[in-house]
Amino acid sequence: MSSEKPKPHLNKTWYVILFIFALSLFSSVFLSTVYYILAPFEERAAIFDRDQQMLTAAHVLDFSGKFQIYEEGSWQPAVYDKKSHLLKVADQHAPVVTSSVLDAYTQGFVRPLLADKLGQMFSFEEKNINVTEFIEKHQNGHFYQQPLLLFYVILANTEQARAMSAADVIKNPSVVRAIIIPISGFGLWGPIYGYLAVENNGDTVLGTAWYQQAETPGLGANIANPQWQKQFYGKKIFLQAAAGNTDFATTPLGLEVIKGSVQSAFGTTPKALSSIDGISGATLTCNGVTEAYAQSLAPYRNLLISFAKLNQRDHNGSK
């Protein structure tokens, strides 16, 4: 009975080194190929998540990822009509929005714009700036530190508004239904990035959302919890005076996440309108969120004031 002769070279040092090198090379090439194939999908998923968070902050989406529309004094489930390209009140339960439908809505009703510190608005085309490159360049930093400030507007749910270019919107800002400002700062463990959506009066909060944060689960990470985010709806980013009036030019601007309950601390005073209940055990994260709102919103003051004045003129004109 014959037996296979041993292969002495298998125990040689050079063979072991060669084998390890070949295995490492194969693994490196394999992982690089997988990354190259999956990178576009990961990027699209990240864009979808940011868009979803933005529209959730603006109350276009509810917290379950379904369209909603403000009709007859309340938010009602809605669907995206692919023929008219408008949102319509749902006859039955609204479906969860898919990536393709979200893209269609965003292209039709969301416009990225620029503003200077004086509140003057510009389109990216007017400034000869590529919007994709601008966002990619600054998205891991602070948009509020740039000479030209990025913001988004949500347009009215009409065919006329949908057909308007960014330049058209600037000429006719009355079609704007919401203003979305990028928010960035630092939590306990690292950077936090999100959005704050404001009504077209430049003051009343629609909502907030965070698309990137690494806070402690169950504690600071609750800034991304819908139950905590719901309390932002209806808050005011310009602090009202005790008499109930607002001096937009001089009053503090921002939202303060306090320690404890707003009701216990401020009751029904104007301060309560610009304050948010804190998160137990996450004081440092809450302080970081407060600072993020203050720093991110400050350069946009004149832009927000311009919308407040426009809203007041429209309100007076409709009387």
From Swiss-Prot:
KW Cell membrane (keyword) present: yes
EC numbers, comma separated: 7.2.1.1
Chief place of localization: membrane
Annotated GO CC locations: plasma membrane
Modified residues (FMN phosphoryl threonine): T283
Summary of subunit composition and partner proteins: Composed of six subunits; NqrA, NqrB, NqrC, NqrD, NqrE and NqrF.
Protein name: Na(+)-translocating NADH-quinone reductase subunit C
Organism in which the protein naturally occurs: Chlamydia caviae (strain ATCC VR-813 / DSM 19441 / 03DC25 / GPIC) (Chlamydophila caviae)
Classification of source organism: Bacteria, Pseudomonadati, Chlamydiota, Chlamydiia, Chlamydiales
Gene this protein is translated from: nqrC
